[in-house]
A protein has these predicted regions:
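Short acidic/histidine-rich active-site segments
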Residues: 3, 140-147, 200, 210-211, ...
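Short acidic/polar active-site loop segments enriched in Thr and Asp
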Residues: 51-52
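Short, acidic/polar
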Residues: 32-42, 58-60, 90, 94
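Active-site-adjacent C-terminal substructures of enzyme catalytic domains
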Residues: 171-218
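Active-site mouth loops of central-metabolism enzymes
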Residues: 23-35, 112, 116-118
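Metal-coordinating catalytic core of metallo-dependent amide/deamination hydrolases
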Residues: 62-182
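Single conserved hydrophobic/aromatic residue that forms the stacking wall/gate
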Residues: 1-5, 9
């Protein structure tokens, strides 16, 4: 659903890219922009043989509509940021997305809860997300260990890596799709293996933003 921004901002570190480019650009998008951006992305995916994708964004009803109309499969999450005044409202949006779309389109649409990342979701908010996901027997999609800075900041604040922090919150017991996982330790990998955490490797984004390369062979 963010195809329109995919070729615009090259070679920028993640936080500069998000704060100064992507988030301001996204503030100007409306539901129709997201619908047609999703349709474009789906066309590009199908053209190259991709038949399933995972997306975390906003106006996800429009994304689900595009998935329903095109025949592709998708795992959809409402992107959740716990730092804004409407954070609880967005969690309710994700709940409604789950109730309205999970298992729909002949089972092609799966809905997860989408806390964006450790640096945008404080622990009290993450606890709410995990509780709601557990209540609905839903899984969770989250960006984890994308950059070295994310990991070091998390260790400074919590004395734990992002993987260890999420494990301490019982997030992985819900079933988790973790995006990126570039900077993970051997101890992190042991936790991920034990909890059956699935990784969505994103080499194009990680290389464009010089975040690093996930240890996929591990």
């Amino acid at each position: 659903s963010s195809s329109a921004a995919s070729d615009v901002y090259k070679r920028q570190v993640l936080m500069d890219w998000l704060q100064n480019k992507i988030w301001p650009a996204e503030a100007g998008l409306n539901d129709e922009d997201i619908y047609w951006g999703t349709m474009l992305s789906i066309a590009e995916m199908l053209k190259t043989g991709t038949t399933c994708f995972a997306d975390m964004y906003f106006a996800m009803d429009k994304v689900a509509q595009a998935v329903n109309e095109t025949g592709i499969r998708a795992s959809l999450s409402r992107g959740l940021v716990g730092l804004t005044p409407d954070a609880d409202e967005k969690l309710q949006d994700n709940e409604m997305l789950f109730k309205n779309w999970h298992g729909k389109a002949d089972g092609r649409i799966r809905v997860m809860f989408g806390p964006h990342a450790p640096y945008t979701c404080p622990v009290p908010y993450l606890k709410k997300v995990v509780a709601k996901a557990g209540e609905l027997n839903a899984e969770i999609h989250m960006h984890l260990c994308e950059t070295a800075g994310e990991v070091s900041d998390c260790v400074k604040e919590h004395n734990m890596t992002p993987i260890k922090l999420m494990n301490s919150l019982d997030m992985f017991d819900c079933g988790t799709l973790a995006a990126h996982c570039v900077h993970v330790s051997e101890a992190d990998l042991d936790i991920m293996a034990d909890k059956k955490v699935r990784v969505a490797h994103n080499p194009q984004s990680n290389l464009k933003l010089a975040s690093g390369i996930a240890p996929v062979p591990a």
